[in-house]
């Protein structure tokens, strides 16, 4: 299997399966001298960790990360950083009934056809369990970017099913009005406090029905420097979409206004420039594939997981029709735990592009002052 490495100068290679002994990652290209401890990584891992509320999977993993290499006396050395997380709460017996059948909506059929075999225990390599290593690696990138630029990367769930987040006093949702501390204080990472109770009732009903529901996640990077992105084929927004689309269950990504631009006229959509700053940010902080210095804003659509307790039709390994019910412990809404994963993938993309920009354009000087974001 190829395709396990993300990035060009700041690279992350992950390995491991859902029900294997553990998960791991190698991060190469991290500059030396960054103060780094396991506690720095654990903060985001705990936000993603399963079994933390009634609205996520009941699988309980400590997800305690170990730094194996690349850090000496509390600082990165510039050599590859090795990370490891042990799996401790596998329950492979839950998947015995699907060993010979394909779960509809999952990677079972495509993995089987591509590789001629598959790890049916929780999906093996195709499981979202793999994303724990992305979150750990992303925490390194977030820390470096925060110290270098004061950059913050934050995400929240802005829609679950037909429940959509609003701004203050019912105004349309706006990332600039989000109280990020309140986002961390509710189990849904939801920015609209007026709908938390409604969300709880809604998801409890979904769980009773043994079903699942989709979600929308919004991720925002602030204090991004101008100039990140490598046109033509490595445009910043293209690589952001690549990183976010690689997250399990993501079926759509928008940058800035995304598909809403279809209804906009050019006179509305263009982000006019003034000496005081940009008038709007319909572009989501990227112009011509290069960061403009404005907030980078992206939205992710996550499908409802197909691992549900509702009987569905499928075929077995010999192509015969059969019915299937997926047992095991699964998230009723995978979008909730996708919040730190989205932050991680945006951080990894921006970190990689910063190093690429510095490598080629460090000596470029421009007399035009940066426009305020």
Curated annotation (Swiss-Prot):
The gene is aroC. One of its GO terms (molecular function) is FMN binding. It is an enzyme of class 4 (lyase). This reaction introduces a second double bond into the aromatic ring system. Its EC number is 4.2.3.5. It comes from the Bacteria. HAMAP family: Chorismate_synth (MF_00300). One of its GO terms (cellular component) is cytosol. It holds the Pfam family Chorismate_synt. Belongs to the chorismate synthase family. FMN binds at residues 125-127, 248-249, 288, 303-307, 329. This is Chorismate synthase.
């Amino acid at each position: 299997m190829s395709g396990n490495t993300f990035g060009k100068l700041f690279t992350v290679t992950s390995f491991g399966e859902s029900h294997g002994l553990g998960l791991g990652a190698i991060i190469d290209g991290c500059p030396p001298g960054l103060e780094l401890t396991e506690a720095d990584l654990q903060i985001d891992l705990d936000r993603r960790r399963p079994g933390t509320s009634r609205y996520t999977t009941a699988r309980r993993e400590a997800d305690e990360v170990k730094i194996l290499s690349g850090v000496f006396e509390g600082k990165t050395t510039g050599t590859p950083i090795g990370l490891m997380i042990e799996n401790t709460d596998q329950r492979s017996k839950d998947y015995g009934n699907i060993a010979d059948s394909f779960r509809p909506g999952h990677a079972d059929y495509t993995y089987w056809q591509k590789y001629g075999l598959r790890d049916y225990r929780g999906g093996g390599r195709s499981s979202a369990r793999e994303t724990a290593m992305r979150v750990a690696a992303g925490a390194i990138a977030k820390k470096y970017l925060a110290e270098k630029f004061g950059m913050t990367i934050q995400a929240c769930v802005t829609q679950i099913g037909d429940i959509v987040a609003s701004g203050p006093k019912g105004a349309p949702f706006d990332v600039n009005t989000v109280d990020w501390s309140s986002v961390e204080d509710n189990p849904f990472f939801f920015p609209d406090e007026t709908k938390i109770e409604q969300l709880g009732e809604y998801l409890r009903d979904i769980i009773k029905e043994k079903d699942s529901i989709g979600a929308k996640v919004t991720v925002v990077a602030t204090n991004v420097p101008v100039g990140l992105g490598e046109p033509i084929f490595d445009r910043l927004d293209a690589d952001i979409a690549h990183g976010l689309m690689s997250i399990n269950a993501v079926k759509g990504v928008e940058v800035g206004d995304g598909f809403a631009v279809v209804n906009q006229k050019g006179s509305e959509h263009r982000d006019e420039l003034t000496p005081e700053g940009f008038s709007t940010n319909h572009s989501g902080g990227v112009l011509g594939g290069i960061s403009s210095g404005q907030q980078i804003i992206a939205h992710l659509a996550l499908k409802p997981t197909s691992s549900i307790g509702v009987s569905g039709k499928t075929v077995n390994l010999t192509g015969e029709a059969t019915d299937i019910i997926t047992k095991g412990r699964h998230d009723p809404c995978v979008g909730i735990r996708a919040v730190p994963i989205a932050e991680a993938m945006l951080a990894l993309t921006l970190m990689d592009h910063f190093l690429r920009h510095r490598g080629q354009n460090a000596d470029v000087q421009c007399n035009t002052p940066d426009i305020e974001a």
